[in-house]
């Protein structure tokens, strides 16, 4: 696969966020690191690691506008870690998973990340969620040399330039590559569509738009953007309707899928919708529609029938998939109750990859060794993801592709096979690799 890295198109954290991090660091500097828990520097940094435990941190919106769905991701990771711990841990070490609420607010993300690094002294961060939120802390984590693994966001910032962020790794398919795959499908299957874009006003939306324009630039007739936190998207949807967009592509979080659908209903606007995997879970969006409409919308999941989307993981409704079967068993034995959802599946999948990296690193675990493992071996890691990881010394981007899917009767149906690509001018090709199957016990083997 040809790969072109991108330079000069970065979405940098504003100086104000850097100042907040500095203030937080100074405030907590007195906590220091416990020298007794670390080996000499020459042996590598073992902060957060003892003979019996590995301390791992994460930030998620457990409250606030982005909490629906996203707040359950760490429950999936916790269930998987509990299962691994119950089976002896990783080289005898149990994983101590510490999750803090940032309410999808970058200022709060800065504060709680400082706590995790300087007070809790975590070994690594895993799955910290959000593009605007993680942009506020990525420089701090890298300057502190804390492994920042599997960021829960498809921003290219997490992996397109390892020299700038050597300690950070993406996980899911990046938004630019997703935009390319969506754009190519539209160009091939709906070449006469008048395309409107509904975008989150940050790197999430901007990267998606860049990928789309590689294939359907001339088809795009309108672009509407929203700022996270607001609840009225009437002007944005009305603008798309005014331009007679008959296909709307949304790079947005689930709450705004529901809000855009409610506004479209009020305006009697009925385009074909194509939401990214981020905002297309029918069960969650259906519940949000009922909530936001104060019960006026019933069976909201049915409103998404016919909606196009993408997928880089199997859907929980696919009960014949061996990964779904394995994770469902683990969820039933170690989860926090209720049926397994796609969000808990996401967290379990990240936790599986992290355990895979720990196993591949070996018993002598250091921060430096973990990063080296991901760069040298991560490209060969397998798991529930459909496409290979792109991990190497030159790229810290996550999985390399996805399927185009369609929602029918609350189920996710494949429209294409696995399409793989990369950022920049890399071509889109159909993957020839077969999907992997999980180990019998659901735990990656030690090397």
Predicted regions, residues:
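Periplasmic-binding protein-like
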Residues: 116-129, 147-151, 195-199, 244-254, ...
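Immediate post-signal peptide segment of exported/extracytoplasmic ligand-binding proteins
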Residues: 38-58, 89-94, 187-193, 364
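Extracellular/periplasmic periplasmic-binding protein-like sensory domains
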Residues: 264-348, 440-441
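Short, low-complexity disordered leader/linker segments with a strong preference
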Residues: 1-55, 430-447
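Extracytoplasmic "Venus flytrap"
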Residues: 40-78, 100-107, 129-130, 198-206, ...
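Segments of small-molecule ligand-sensing domains
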Residues: 333-344, 355-414
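Beta-alpha junction/loop-to-helix N-cap segments that form part of ligand/metal-binding clefts
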Residues: 40-44, 68-75, 87-161, 171, ...
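Extracellular/periplasmic Venus flytrap/periplasmic-binding protein
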Residues: 107-111, 155-157, 164-268, 318
